[in-house]
Amino acid sequence: MSDKQINLVIVTGMSGAGKTVAIQSFEDLGYFTVDNMPPALVPKFLELLERTNETQKVALVVDMRSRRFFKEINSILDHIELNANLKLRILFLDATDSELVSRYKETRRSHPLAADGRVLDGIRRERELLVPLKSMSQHVVNTTDLTPRQLRKVISDQFSSESDQASFRIEVMSFGFKYGLPLDADLVFDVRFLPNPYYQVALREQTGLDQAVFDYVMTHQESEAFYNHLLDLIVPILPAYQKEGKSVLTIAIGCTGGQHRSVAFAHRLAQDLTADWPLHESHRDINRRKETVNRS
């Protein structure tokens, strides 16, 4: 059995109050997540996690979709409280009756407790049954006036710690426009206006990771000026992206073929940012031209 404590968050609350967004937010924070776990399986699941010692952060959605929820939840909570290796917190999501009715009408889904099909009756019944659990919850969040992004921000603020800063990371990548834009890019910068090393015979087969190409790209006055503007733009906005709860920010820099100019710029940017942020550097098309030539 593990000697490390497992941080367990049970996500529950009113149906339609935002539990799907919540569990996705916990996943972005590095939690192992399970949606709609039958309450009876929770103790066995936690015992397995303790034995394997694979994760110390777990978030489970347990709600009215589990039909025996109210018969089993109290005994499960008692079991967890007796286990010294488990630190339990309950997140209860709520919203006004009118907002929940509006959300159900929008999605055209039926309420799990609306036996006669009347959503409002199901909401009222569920709210009554959840009173004891709500009173036990350490975190109660009313999502009536929250957008999904705002709810993610609330969860990040309440459940992330300083050690979770690595849950926000930066991906710096180079690419070639001739092969298409990266579909997952958040910020895209075009350096095709810079002098192209491709037209220097001695540099053509090298890449922006080679010192000769890097120096050729960066020694031009317009390159240095643009890079300084780029850095001045990116550095101040990174904390804002992190604050908004974004888990990965992908910065893509493109040139024509993705072999020279964009590689040099992406590499320099990664070098300058990596001291302050978790970062991964990649060059999508750096070998694309060579592969194409070899196939022809």
UniProtKB/Swiss-Prot annotation:
ATP binds at residues 13-20. It holds the Pfam family PapZ_C. It comes from the Bacteria. GTP binds at residues 63-66. InterPro entries: P-loop_NTPase (IPR027417), RapZ-like (IPR005337), RapZ-like_N (IPR053930), RapZ_C (IPR053931). Keywords: ATP-binding, GTP-binding, Nucleotide-binding. GO terms for molecular function: ATP binding; GTP binding. Belongs to the RapZ-like family. Displays ATPase and GTPase activities. This is Nucleotide-binding protein SZO_12220. It comes from Streptococcus equi subsp. zooepidemicus (strain H70).
